Amino acid sequence: MTKVADLSHIRELMKKRKERANEFNSIKHVDLQDNGTRNSPIKQFLLQKAWKYVIIAAWFVASLFFFGYLLNRGNTDLTKEMSPASLPVICVRENGHDFNRMFGYTTEMDYSVIRDGITPLQTGRKLNVRVYKMGEKINNISYELRSIDKERFVEEGDVTTYTQTSEYMDLSFTFKDIISEKTDYSLKIILTLENDRKAYYYARIFEDDTLNFSEKLDYVYYFNDCTFDKETAQDEIGKYMESNSSGDNTNFSHVNIHSSMDQVTWGSLEVKRVDEPVCTVGEIDSKNALMKLEYTVSALTGEEERLYSVTEYYRFIKGSDRMYLLSFDRYMNTILYADKGVVYKDKLMLGIMPSDFEHAESKDGNTYAFVNNNALFVVNSEQNTFGTAYSFYDKDNDDDRCLNPDHDIKIVSIDESGNVIFYTYGYFNRGDYEGKCGIHLFEYNSKTNVVEEKLFIECDKPYEIIKEDLEKLAYANLLGEFYFYFDQKIYKANIAEQQIETIVENLNNENLYVCANNSMCAWVSKEDSIGVLQMTFLRMDTSERYTIDAKGGERIKALGFMGEDLIYGDAKIDDIYENVYGEKIVPMYNLNIINKFKEILKKYSEENIYVTGCRINDNLITLMRDTKDENGSLVSAPPDSIVNSLMEKTYKNNSEVIATENLKKIVQVTLKREMDNKKIKFKTPKTEMYEGKREVLLNTDSENIFYAYSLNECLGEFTDLSKAIKTADENYGTVIDCDGHYAWKKETYASTNQIMKIVETSEINDDTSSLERCIETILEYEGFSLDVKKNLSEGMNPGDIIEKNVPYSKGLDLKNSSSDEIKYYLNKDIPVIAMAGDNTVLVVGYSDKVYVWLNPRSGNLMKVNVDEAETFYENNGYHFVTYMKWDS
């Protein structure tokens, strides 16, 4: 049966072959005289075959279009462009000028720490504001006035009287006379928009009729006007400048008071203002003022016109006859777009901008990413592409809201495929999170040209506070985890599960050490009154952690990271001591450099040499060293250095500053390979969205934190008030606590002041310490009578005793603070304890020549020469105890 089946199968095949042969034979015997006319069998055959292929090809092409349509229709659901800005803008008005511009929030914020400028009220507690509608319909305007810490309600109401045009509404507030002079209050303005959307605007207002505010505001606007007119400038503002050889006249990115008049008036640049400057008032009193102007200019270079953002800082005082300029700084930064004007062969001509800017490259150097003016750009020289990966502004979205600089972008990593992981943080100018503050993590896919949203973490703190913490630590790994430092805590966000957990809390930023690329960190995890017993080391790329413990009879101290390697030292307990300023000195007899695997790469020790600190600069460690003399006392020894030759990094794409004719110095990047200018693809990606939200809320609970501010910029976050004051003092700034109360302020103090309510007392007996009497005198001055001996014996410190008994106050312990800095409190009739053991005194007044002390032992008031007092303060470490107060 099998053979029969095989034969029949063969016969069938032979039959088919014969039929095919006959078919071709018929073609062979055709009369060729037809010459391929319509009736030609060859042509008919070929046409039949051709039509079959045409039909198949047509079906294939139609299928491609059909499936492409389906795919594109699906992508429309998955990706979208960033929606335009939709919130109105509010400015305070004075003498025809806009100042202290407010951008709207779509959620309520912790406004006690928002310092977007301070706003003086006009005479009679009046405030004029202008609401720029920006094309939005405003259904209602209301307001709420509270104490700066939000605890006390002052007044609220709806705004029903205003004048308006198609573009703006002018409002006027007159507040009740229950507000106190020279006291800050928080004003919240609420706009109700269409669909019952609410936008919140915050201002810090105060009443003080001694400021000459209108005159000072006119001064900065007039100064700015003059810089655009060379002839007028020489006569009108030349007298304010201090032009000398220290001024850099080769670079427009930073111009200062020492620059030449030609440089201040824009040199040979054809510059035009494209919008009106808006002023932010940072600090102001009867004499001093600190103000900032922000605006945009255009400049023509050859045939090309570019836009630039400009920020000017003015610090000046009002004299009896005129203003005196103490400092002037102008910063200029190119507003870039991903277009042909930037790329030329292997060069990126970035233009006038800071030379120190955020940038990164892939390992092979084919992909290069950089940040300019809060926008992220990605160049792929291999694929010949250049695009804006993320930006709130573009050529269709370029108003004040889109150019608001209150956010930053940081690049985390770039892989070999050119995909960029990055995050942006601060205030979101437009898009799905418009009007919110937080941290937004993304991945840019270079092949699909799509920005994928990973996670949005919302918080109620303003940009300046977020920036201060995130610049210490933020890192995303390949495990779908995002680590960041905020509010004295390290958090880990699980991207897939949209959850946040706390890794460590109550972590003073001075006890946190982070490597340059943010992938490693270490912190103090166990300590006692002597020093550090244990540190924890965390690899955020793998989420592994381990501890480093001190040996018996020793303590350890971290000095920082060199690359990804941690440097820490070992010290004997007997060698650790406090200096006169209360600073702990840890002389380390041995240094260790360990890698991420906890392997010791190097030890450093020399006989009778103790390392007390170091400076780390790239791959160079400079060691500060002491040695013991014949008496066993530590004395200074020559410094030493350690070089890590393996850490030197070379880039395949290199930035440099070059000189040009009109623009002077500009920033240029030389790419790994040359790009074809005729074939460059300029990309503008869309954002990939997901069903549901990729948003989590971060609950914050700041305590015992002080913020140093200058203008509206946060200079640092501190748990040590003395360091916060020193930072603010150097920058003509202010220190506030986490509730927004002033802890210290650089201002004009009265030349002399004495707290007259504090009078001489009886001398103390041997059972009473001078510190007890000083504290009791303060409490009596504040209207309370208390024996503090028990409190002190129970271990309470003086500041805590004052804070516990004086309402609406906070005790302050200041170490290594200058005598000038304590005048802030004395000027406000707040006494200051000068700590000196049994010789502690209470400072109650000052003048140019003397300080007034209450000597608690004798009970007498005494005038002490300034030099003598200075020596006393210095010998006791400039250690003071005082307190801050605020209205109930």
Whereabouts are the PLM-identified features?
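Beta-propeller fold detector
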Residues: E155-G157, F328, F386-K395, V450-C459, ...
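Beta-propeller blade signature
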Residues: G435-N449, M535-D541, E583-K598
